[in-house]
Structure formats: C-alpha cells, structure tokens
C-alpha cells in the first residue's frame, strides 16, 4: 500500500504557502496568530 504523504515542495507551497494564506481573511488571521505567538516560521 502506498503511503499517504508523498512530499512535493510545489504542492506544499501552493496549499500552505505565505501567499495562499494572505489571500483569505482566515489565512491572514492564521499568520497574525502565528506572529503574535512569536513563531519563527509563519508559513511553509
């Protein structure tokens, strides 16, 4: 059986990247929450 996680940098960035997060109101909320928490990496 094939494993579920087949890494791909392109797909990772396109689904969870910074630009994608900034597109929606909810995504911006995620970035702001991570900024407030002091996360080193805001998005993938």
From Swiss-Prot:
Keywords: Ribonucleoprotein, Ribosomal protein. It comes from the Bacteria. Pfam families: Ribosomal_L34 (PF00468). The keyword rRNA-binding does not apply. Disulfide bonds: none annotated. One of its GO terms (biological process) is translation. Transmembrane segments: none annotated. InterPro entries: Ribosomal_bL34, Ribosomal_bL34_CS. GO terms for cellular component: ribonucleoprotein complex; ribosome. One of its GO terms (molecular function) is structural constituent of ribosome. NCBIfam families: rpmH_bact (TIGR01030). Belongs to the bacterial ribosomal protein bL34 family. This is Large ribosomal subunit protein bL34.
